[in-house]
């Protein structure tokens, strides 16, 4: 009897261990991929590759998707050309192009900060360069004392006041982060603007790699999961500026928070955004 109990206990323990191992999901692996790269950058390439292989074994479609996303993440932080003040020549000159202007936190009273106006000035120049492109202004309510005022609507009003034709304007005014900008913008473009095949990002110079990453990753993920048409980030135009809150040596941290938010790991994303010193980093 005693030996039978021991055997039964061993079997139950093995089942518990197996159950715990089986509980690891594809989303868990993707979270690890993001965190390893976000914490260690290229030093974690070997570990990230192992995780991508693990993900592919679990889900071939998502494995291929995330390999492409990680290649793009490396690209934006090393080789992405950032074009100041205007878009490059040679982009599509028809309505397949959408110029996406990323919002920036409003003043407490709802007025726009100088940095946001700078982005809009660049966007207006881009709209004149490509007169057949639509212009999407994206950003939600970030004014502490005027929550009814949104970045997207304020930006759109500014563009109209400075000569943009109303039929070219698209407003997305529910997003509070760059990750939400990307996801909400795709929904609008996919459902209401079937001619759009590519986007050009307009933002501050330090934010272009970050914004391009989250938009391309968000667009890729949305199209892959829905089995719908792909929209690509093909270029950018930057308002040249710096920002003490978003220092160059910390941009990987903010990118990581955005990527985690994009996959629905909001609590972990908030740690990277606002409590980075206490983030429990994975061991390399």
Name every feature range the model reports, one short phrase each.
Residues 134-136, 156-174, 220-240:
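A non-catalytic structural micro-motif
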């Amino acid at each position: 009897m005693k030996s039978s109990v021991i055997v039964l206990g061993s079997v139950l323990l093995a089942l518990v261990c197996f159950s715990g191992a089986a509980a690891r999901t594809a989303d868990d692996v993707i979270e690890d991929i993001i965190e390893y790269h976000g914490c260690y950058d290229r030093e974690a390439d070997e570990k990230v590759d192992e995780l991508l292989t693990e993900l592919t074994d679990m889900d071939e479609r998502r494995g291929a998707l995330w390999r492409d996303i990680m290649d793009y993440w490396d690209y934006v932080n090393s080789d992405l050309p950032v074009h100041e003040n205007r878009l490059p020549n040679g982009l599509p000159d028809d309505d397949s192009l959408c110029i996406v202007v990323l919002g920036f936190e409003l003043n407490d009273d709802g007025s726009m900060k100088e940095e946001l106006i700078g982005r809009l000035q660049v966007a207006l120049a881009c709209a004149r360069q490509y007169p057949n492109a639509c212009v999407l202004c994206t950003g939600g309510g970030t004014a502490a004392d005027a929550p009814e005022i949104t970045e997207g609507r304020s930006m759109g009003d500014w563009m109209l006041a400075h000569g943009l034709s109303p039929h070219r304007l698209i407003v997305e005014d529910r997003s509070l982060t760059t990750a939400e900008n990307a996801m909400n913008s795709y929904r609008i473009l996919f459902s209401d603007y079937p001619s759009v095949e590519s986007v050009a990002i307009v933002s501050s110079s330090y934010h272009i790699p970050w914004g391009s990453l989250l938009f391309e990753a968000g667009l890729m993920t949305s199209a892959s999961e829905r089995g719908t048409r792909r929209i690509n980030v093909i270029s950018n135009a930057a308002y040249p500026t710096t920002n003490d809150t978003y220092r160059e040596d910390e941009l990987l941290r903010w990118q990581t928070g955005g990527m985690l938010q994009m996959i629905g790991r909001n609590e972990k994303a908030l740690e990277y955004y606002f409590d980075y010193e206490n983030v429990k980093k994975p061991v390399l």
